[in-house]
Amino acid sequence: MHAIVEQLKSTVAATAATDIRGAFASDPKRFERFSSRFDDLLMDYSKCAVNDEIMALLETLCTQAGVAEKREAMFNGEAINFTEGRAVLHTALRNRANTPVVVDGKNVMPDVNAVLHAMSAFAEGLRQGTITGSTGLQITDVVNIGIGGSDLGPAMATLALAPFHDGPRLHFVSNVDGAHIADTLKLLEPETTLFIVASKTFTTIETMTNAATARAFIASALGEDAVGDHFAAVSTALEKVAAFGIGSDRVFGFWDWVGGRYSIWSAIGLPLMIAVGADNFVEFLAGAHAMDMHFRTAPFRENLPMLLGAIGYHHRNVLDYPTRAILPYDQRLSRFPAYLQQLDMESNGKGVTIDGSPVKGNSGPVVWGEPGTNGQHAFYQLIHQGTSVIPAEFMIAAKGFEPELRHQHDLLIANCLAQSAALMKGRTLDEAKGQLLKSGMDQAKADHIAPHRVFTGNRPSITFVYEQLTPFALGRLIALYEHRVFVEGVLFGINSFDQWGVELGKELATGLLPVVQGKAGTDGQDASTAGLVAALSDLGR
C-alpha cells in the first residue's frame, strides 16, 4: 500500500490534480465523470483533486487493503473488533430483509426483532396515552439521559426529523454539569414527564449521576412508588435497573456487538421512535439498510461509501489535509457535525495498526462543522483564505418542509452552491484588481487592496444533494458516513471499533474525585493537577 500512496503523490504532482479550477476549464464534462448517484442521493466529488489516474489508484488501494473482504467479514458477524473480541453488527439492527445474521452460531435476528417490537409497543403506548404517569395523566415530555453514543445519535436524529414529530416533546441531558439537568427540569412537570436512562452497564458515571437527580425530582414530587411509572431504561444490567426502581417491562436491551457510536439503530433510538412513531422509525432503518446493500453491491466508481472513504483517505494521507468540515445546509442537521465528529474521531483517532505497529502516515482527521448559512458568517473565512486547505462536505435537500417559505429554501440552496463554487474557483489577483477598478477605485489603491481580496481557489469540496430530509433519507445518510469511516479505517490499517482513548480519562477522574472533594490529599498527583485542585479549593470548593 505504501507504494501506491507514493504513486498517488507523484501522480498528483505530475497531473496538476490540485488545479481543480483548471480541470473544470479543460473538461466541460467533469461533473458527469466525477459524480455518482444512488437513487435520489447525488454525490458530487468533481471539485476534489482527483482525475481518472488517481481514481484508478484509489480503487487499487482499496483492493490491496482488502476493503471488500473486510466489509463482508463485518456483515457476516466475524469478530473484526479483535481488541475486544466482538463482532460489529449495527447493520443487523436495520436488516429489513431479515436475512439470518449469525454470531457465535446463533441467528441474532429474532432477538433484534423482539426488541424492536417491544420498543414499538412502548413508544406507541406513550404516544397514544395508554401508558401514563403515576397520576394517570398522559406523558407530554420525555427526557433521555445518556452520554456519547447514548445521546449524540438520538439527539441529532430527533432534531433532524422535527417535521415528523407528533408525539411527546423530547429533551436530552448528557453533561454531568448539574446545569444541564437543572435547566431541563425547570421546564417540566413531574406528573407528565418520563425519563429514559440509557446506559448499557447502568454504571456510566455521568448518566447515573443525572439519573439520580431525575429520580429525586420524581420521588420528591410524587413519592417513591411513582418512580417506576416515570422511568424506562436502555440497558442490559437488569439487576441494577431493578434496584433503581424500573420494572423489567420498561427495560430495552442491546448487545455487545453494537458500539455506542453505532447504536442509534438499537433501543438507544427509543427517544426518536417516541417522537416520530414506530412507522417512521422503521423507515429510518430502511434507509440505512438500503445504503448497506448499496455498499455491498455497487462497483467502486458507483459506490458512494467507497468513493467517500477513498477520497477522504486521499485528502488525509496523500494531500496531508488535517481536518474536514461538515457543512449541512439544513438547520435541523445542526447536530450532524457533532455526531460525525464522534463517529469519525472515536473510530479512526488511532495511532496503532491492527498488528500493533505505529500507523504510517496519518490516521483520522479532525472533524468539525456547523450548518449553513451560519458558518458563512463565522469560520468560512479561514476555509476560503486560510493557510490550511480544509476539505468541505456540503449537503442540501432539494425541498424543505415549509412550502410557504420556498423563497428562503431557494436562498439556502443558492448559498450552498455558491460556497462550493467559490472554494473551487477563487479569485485571481487580476480579477480582484479589475473588480476594484470597476467600482471606481484608483489604480494605486487597487494595487494595494487587491491582494487582500485574492482567493486561491482549488479548495476541495464534496456536495451531497437529495430530495428531502425524510426518515429514510436520514437513515441512508448516516449509514453512508458509517461505511465511509469503515473504509478509511481499513485503509489506515486500524481497528475502527474500539475506543481505549476514552478510558484513561475516566480512570483518572475516578481517582481525582476524592481529591477534589477534600477527602484525599494531592500526594501522587502531578504538580499541575495539584496546583489546579488547590486553586479551585481557594475559590470556594
Curated annotation (Swiss-Prot):
- Give the signal peptide, or none: none
- Show the GO MF annotations: carbohydrate derivative binding; glucose-6-phosphate isomerase activity; monosaccharide binding
Q: What does this protein do?
A: Catalyzes the reversible isomerization of glucose-6-phosphate to fructose-6-phosphate.
UniProt enzyme class: isomerase
Pathway, according to UniProt?
Answer: Carbohydrate biosynthesis; gluconeogenesis; Carbohydrate degradation; glycolysis; D-glyceraldehyde 3-phosphate and glycerone phosphate from D-glucose: step 2/4
Mind telling me what this protein is named?
Glucose-6-phosphate isomerase
Task: Please provide, in alphabetical order, the Gene Ontology terms of the cellular component aspect for this entry.
Answer: cytosol
Gene3D superfamilies according to UniProt: 1.10.1390.10, Glucose-6-phosphate isomerase like protein, domain 1
Chief place where the protein resides:
cytoplasm
Keywords on this record? Cytoplasm, Gluconeogenesis, Glycolysis, Isomerase
